[in-house]
Amino acid sequence: AQVTEDLVQSSVVSSTGVTDFGNTVASDDNRASFDCSSGTNIIFELTNLSQTPTSIVSAQIRHEAQAQTIQSAVVSMEMLNSSNTQINTQNTTFSTTSDFSQNLTVHTTNDLTSAAFTADDINTLRVKITYITETGTVTTALIDHIFVRVIYNIADPVAGLIKLTSGKIKLNSGLIGIKN
């Protein structure tokens, strides 16, 4: 079975020029402020996968942000390992006067190892955002939501006891046996 999961910020490792970053865990118009000036950056850790993968299909940074102006701020977004070594990087923009969603490159391999991501790679993944430049004047960009979308495979369930405390079970085919 394949699972798609969005990993959000769990803790900030370091930050310069960024405030209220805890506001970025949901798309809810509560925003972090990102100062558009030299030296502004943030490194943050992500939540862990909720299930144990048999393999990782892909990882992709996605964000909703704005520049509060018709101008644009250019930032780099990097995936880092737990030692802050860069796995990959891509420039993106914070632009327009309302939240704008952007999906960055889908990565199927860890550029450090040239192999597929492992569960440990993903569970220790960090993201770094760094201010690069701007077109016009952008004083402060706002980040509403940022996450890493991970698609992974999990083992199919094996035969055994299913315990359901509430809800419904839908069976498209097969038999159900009930024992006391």
Q: Which positions does each model-derived feature cover?
A:
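Disulfide-rich extracellular domains of secreted proteins
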Residues: 1-157
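Viral virion structural and adsorption modules
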Residues: 158-180
